From Swiss-Prot:
Native organism: Anaeromyxobacter sp. (strain K)
Name of encoding gene: rpsP
GO-annotated molecular function: structural constituent of ribosome
Pfam families for this protein: Ribosomal_S16 (PF00886)
Domain of life: Bacteria
The protein, known as: Small ribosomal subunit protein bS16
Gene Ontology CC: one annotated term: small ribosomal subunit
Length: 88
């Protein structure tokens, strides 16, 4: 079983939001998943990104591969959470 981290679409017509899920790569986009590990809402300004970092790290260590979009979301979240160094 190849586990991937990818987006599962939810919401209404023209108002989507996405769940970040760990699932078998053979499952449908909105089908059965192993675990819900976050939420991504691109319609909010600024974008709403809520991730369960510990669970994402668990799945990555277990061999799960993130989709291109999830990898981009993880980079954005890491950049937003990084401490800013004060200017001297």
């Amino acid at each position: 079983m190849a586990v991937v981290l990818r987006l599962s679409r939810a919401g209404t017509h023209k108002a989507p939001f996405y769940h970040v899920v760990a699932t078998d790569s053979r499952n449908a986009r909105d089908g059965k998943y192993l675990e819900d590990v976050g939420i991504y809402d691109p319609t909010k300004r600024p974008e709403r990104i809520e991730l369960k970092v510990e669970r994402i790290e668990h799945w990555l260590k277990a061999g799960a591969k993130p989709s291109q979009t999830v990898a981009m979301i993880l980079k954005r979240a890491a950049k937003a959470a990084a401490p800013v160094a004060p200017k001297a």
